């Protein structure tokens, strides 16, 4: 049976395709917008049976061209939180997903889609509940609105197959180089350290000390595992947080990156204080442009995910970032012109 992955040349989508390949799944249709064209690298070592541009995909799917489809992983979206074109964002993220939902409903196809922790925006509580959702930008709103539609459909029990939304927190890991400035902190710090021997972090802001603003950093390895868990449990629908369940400061990421790079140089690990003293970690003033628009703390509440039966542990920053740095080093040619 066919599996479709939208955003297949993107970060999370390509990792899902890879994991499906490891399972022996090759009957995969990849959907994306290959602008920039360099994203093709994320597909070059993967097995798929067809590729479609996102603009031709919906009509092809609606017409039944793919025969019996088991599931759609919908990872395709504009994820640029600085995008200000609301018409583009709503058409690309909200309306496109609504059309895809209608087709999956008509054909009784499982739909596993990317929501976002951006739906919480300015909230300081990260529980999958309407009162905690306060998106701060049009990206967050585009994801929030589709989640609202799904809540109504869940209540009305109008779905013909599984629908699951994943509120991704700060995801990092392999195959994100095409994202440029929207790539993870770990990715950027790796290249900073490689080029300059140090990494930069924001200084004090929002009541947090230098580098102590904290996020829920989650490895793409864990994100993929959760996606596949729900693929294997089509009886479960809903909207779920997908983070590690831990808030860790940016200092932890910088510390992990610096020590991973030191390990490659066969140097002993250093403490955070030692790295700051050596100027391997430098703090810069918090930019005025981000004041009032920046989340200083996020932490996924995993109560609902655990109640659904997902029991696997999540990688810590120390574990996941160390593995990621090793991957970046081993795949430097794969990442030509990363920024």
Swiss-Prot record:
It catalyses: ADP-D-glycero-beta-D-manno-heptose = ADP-L-glycero-beta-D-manno-heptose. The active site is at 139 (proton acceptor), 179 (proton acceptor). Its cofactor is NADP(+). Its EC number is 5.1.3.20. One of its GO terms (molecular function) is ADP-glyceromanno-heptose 6-epimerase activity. Keywords: Carbohydrate metabolism, Isomerase, NADP. Substrate binds at residues 170, 181, 188, 202-205, 215, 294. One of its GO terms (biological process) is ADP-L-glycero-beta-D-manno-heptose biosynthetic process. Pathway: Nucleotide-sugar biosynthesis; ADP-L-glycero-beta-D-manno-heptose biosynthesis; ADP-L-glycero-beta-D-manno-heptose from D-glycero-beta-D-manno-heptose 7-phosphate: step 4/4. It is an enzyme of class 5 (isomerase). It comes from the Bacteria. Pfam families: Epimerase (PF01370). NADP(+) binds at residues 11-12, 32-33, 39, 54, 75-79, 92, 143, 171, 179. Binds 1 NADP(+) per subunit. Homopentamer. HAMAP family: Heptose_epimerase. Contains a large N-terminal NADP-binding domain, and a smaller C-terminal substrate-binding domain. Catalyzes the interconversion between ADP-D-glycero-beta-D-manno-heptose and ADP-L-glycero-beta-D-manno-heptose via an epimerization at carbon 6 of the heptose. Belongs to the NAD(P)-dependent epimerase/dehydratase family. HldD subfamily. This is ADP-L-glycero-D-manno-heptose-6-epimerase.
